[in-house]
C-alpha cells in the first residue's frame, strides 16, 4: 500500500485490492508492514520478504505470484524483487507497480 512508508494500511487500500482481485480472479495478500519513522527502511521490505517466504512455504508457486503496489507500495514491491534476486530466491511471475 502507499503512504510514503508513514501512513496507510491494507484497510485503507481495500477498495483497490478488492477490485484487482475480482478483475484478475485472484487472491490478494496485503502486507501490513511496519512503518517509519519508528521502523525505517528496510523494515517494511523485511516484513514483505517474510510474507513472501511464508507464501512459498505454504506451497504457493512463485510462477503464480505477482508483487504489486502503489506509491511506497510500488517501491516496496520493486525493492523486494531486487532483494529476492540478490539472495538467489525464487522470483515472482511479475510486478505491477503504480507510481513507484
Residue map of PLM features:
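Domain-scale detector for complete catalytic domains at protein termini or as standalone homologs
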Residues: 1-100
Amino acid at each position: 500500500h502507499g503512504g510514503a512508508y508513514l501512513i496507510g494500511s491494507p484497510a485503507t487500500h481495500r477498495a483497490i485490492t478488492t477490485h484487482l482481485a475480482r478483475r484478475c480472479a485472484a487472491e490478494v495478500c496485503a502486507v501490513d508492514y511496519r512503518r517509519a519513522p519508528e521502523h525505517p527502511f528496510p523494515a517494511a521490505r523485511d516484513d514483505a520478504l517474510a510474507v513472501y517466504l511464508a507464501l512459498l512455504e505454504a506451497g504457493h508457486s512463485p510462477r503464480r505470484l505477482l508483487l504489486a503496489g502503489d506509491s511506497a507500495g510500488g517501491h516496496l514491491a520493486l525493492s523486494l524483487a531486487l532483494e529476492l534476486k540478490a539472495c538467489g530466491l525464487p522470483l515472482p511471475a511479475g510486478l505491477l507497480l503504480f507510481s513507484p
